[in-house]
Amino acid sequence: MRVTLPSLAAAITTAVVLAAPAAQAADPSAMVPAYRPPVQPLSIVSEFRIGGSAQDPGSNEKNTSNINGELLFAKPVTGLDRFWAAFVPRPTVGGSYNVDGRTSYAYLGATWTFDITDRIFVEGFFGAGFHDGRTGPKLFVPKTFNSLGCSPLFREAAGIGYRINEHWSIMATIEHMSNAGLCVENRGLTNYGGKIAYTF
């Protein structure tokens, strides 16, 4: 039987095409795509808090209460050990609404958190507060409002907290806002409250 060169080439090509799937089946690595690490989500929010407070019990705004919400963002510097990381604050924004029609406010600043144990922590805040309260001379301010002098005010806050688990924690808080004597009136506000927090 005489085989021509073109027919031999065609037979070889056909055999290669038919054998390719079988070769891939025999070699499992040929069917597995190259590994690609998963894309990690970039979260800038560190923690969300919600709570309430009693508005300055010793002032004209006593016997009123607030609802408070707060967002803490991720630290701008990471990779430090536990000790030095405590000195890097988390940028913070929040707001407090007085449900009885007295002074409400929004604020921004920085929060420092220090761990006492794995579950107990303390923290401090410093920043600025912007309010809708009364700023005029005390003589012209209604008896049920504090004379805050001006806006914005300095805001300082402190808290002690307990971590229930890796996500949830509870806190007792105190906050103070005033203008440090930079305006004519400076009654300020000192509020006491509590929060529940969720860490992302």
Question: Locations of the language-model features?
Answer:
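Outer-membrane beta-barrel "beta-signal"
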Residues: 65-69, 189-200
